[in-house]
Amino acid sequence: MLPLPPAVTALSAPGKVLLTGGYLVLDRSYTGTVFALDARIHVIVQQLRRNHRREAASGSAHGRSDTPQAEGNVHGDKEDEGTIVVHSPQFVDAVWEYSIQRCEDGGGVLVKQRNDGPRNLFVETSLNFALTYISYVADSKDFGSLSITILADNDYYSETAFSKASGLRSSSRFVDFGVRLQEAHKTGLGSSAALVTALVSSLVIHRTMQPDDLGPGRDKLHNLAQAAHCAAQGKVGSGFDVAAAIYGSCLYRRFSPSILESVGDAGSPGFEERLFRIVEDADPQHPWDTECLDFGMKLPRGMQMVLCDVECGSQTPSMVRKVLEWRKQNQKEADMLWGALQSNNERLRLELRRLAQSPDEHTLSDFENVRTYIQRSRNHIRSMTQKSDVPIEPRVQTELLDALSELEGVIGGVVPGAGGYDAIVLLIQDNPDVITRLKAFFETWESKAEDDFGGKIGKVRLLGVRHGSEGVKNEMLEQYAGWV
């Protein structure tokens, strides 16, 4: 019999930046170099019913607390019925209350939103998938009532006047954005994948594992998060963002899409058995074939990665569809271009790895090959932009990247991932003077280019996020004081 869960479980998962391999990672023939970031999405799960709480233990551990929590039922729910309340306190009215429903014919578990307001599809789908898996593995019919708090490090969203003032008033790592979630502008760091990963992982750890099981259970959590994330976003995407959220920085080759094609919709007959087989990698016809190499890879000493928010996000799924349509209609031309891009990306990765393996602190002159490979990648990407008629590196971004590349200490930069008008990523010399120069540049920068897709760059802001190597991890509860 599985142990009763503790009162509180806390985990976080990182955002990502796909330095190379945008669009290519959609095809298993190609790879992408993805870096985890130090900006993370945090999920804190609290068990609210006495009969689901472990007896108080001495001391506390990473990610867990046995401190007694609220007693009784949540919001007057019936004794035999669990309630889940999800709260994102950094945003206005960001509360979702769900009842838990068990489906017939092995359909698993579905949550149904009780309160008014817009749905949160990523939260809802994550709950459906995680609770279905947990109930099947644990053979449990009673989850009790749960309170789930979601917190995002500040760089996931563009700064607002309210959040700026909030940050000045508080020493907390989290700020109050002062807007509704649907009004907040994302900076393109992979918040949905980090959210899904942290949410399903925290629930599975909370109900079926110990925090120390996080490492050995990472592959199963990866499979569950991929299934939930694909379902929530309409099965568009390669999964590199979830892989980075689970494993951290790595060289990524996507899984075969057929692995998830059989899972079906949550609640459909037999869903819980199909999901179990996918998570446990128990389908001999469709084994998981994701490749994640160079786990925890780091940048060379003397190099740093920074991101800049251009306050004009892209609609990734529609851009992906258009690029894939172009490739289908121009297969030979596209394959030649993608082959050249893959070859250059691999040279860049190997050069970064070679430099990172050296114990020496590198100077700017050591990074000339990196600068050359970045420029070549951009040349190929601009060619794909023109041929596909999709703004992967639109003219206003070219103007910005070219100007930044001329600054002393800047090695080079790209529009990462799917491209467009999202955050840009720069590789720079790890020197405070370079950061000072970048901030001064953005104070006076004004785009003068006439964009080929009608896009506009407003204010450009240097984000505080830096590269990191860790994936999903347990967290200490003290940092959430005042928020949970």
Swiss-Prot record:
It is an enzyme of class 2 (transferase). Pathway: Isoprenoid biosynthesis; isopentenyl diphosphate biosynthesis via mevalonate pathway; isopentenyl diphosphate from (R)-mevalonate: step 2/3. SUPFAM superfamilies: GHMP Kinase, C-terminal domain (SSF55060), Ribosomal protein S5 domain 2-like (SSF54211). Pfam families: GHMP_kinases_C (PF08544), GHMP_kinases_N (PF00288). GO terms for biological process: ergosterol biosynthetic process; farnesyl diphosphate biosynthetic process, mevalonate pathway; isopentenyl diphosphate biosynthetic process, mevalonate pathway. GO terms for molecular function: ATP binding; phosphomevalonate kinase activity. It catalyses: (R)-5-phosphomevalonate + ATP = (R)-5-diphosphomevalonate + ADP. It comes from the Eukaryota. GO terms for cellular component: peroxisome. ATP binds at residues 184-194. Keywords: ATP-binding, Kinase, Lipid biosynthesis, Lipid metabolism, Nucleotide-binding, Steroid biosynthesis, Steroid metabolism, Sterol biosynthesis, Sterol metabolism, Transferase. Its EC number is 2.7.4.2. Residues 54-77 are annotated as: Disordered. Phosphomevalonate kinase; part of the second module of ergosterol biosynthesis pathway that includes the middle steps of the pathway. Erg8 converts 5-phosphomevalonate to 5-diphosphomevalonate. The second module is carried out in the vacuole and involves the formation of farnesyl diphosphate, which is also an important intermediate in the biosynthesis of ubiquinone, dolichol, heme and prenylated proteins. Activity by the mevalonate kinase erg12 (AFUA_4G07780) first converts mevalonate into 5-phosphomevalonate. Belongs to the GHMP kinase family. Mevalonate kinase subfamily. This is Phosphomevalonate kinase erg8. It comes from Aspergillus fumigatus (strain ATCC MYA-4609 / CBS 101355 / FGSC A1100 / Af293) (Neosartorya fumigata). The gene is erg8.
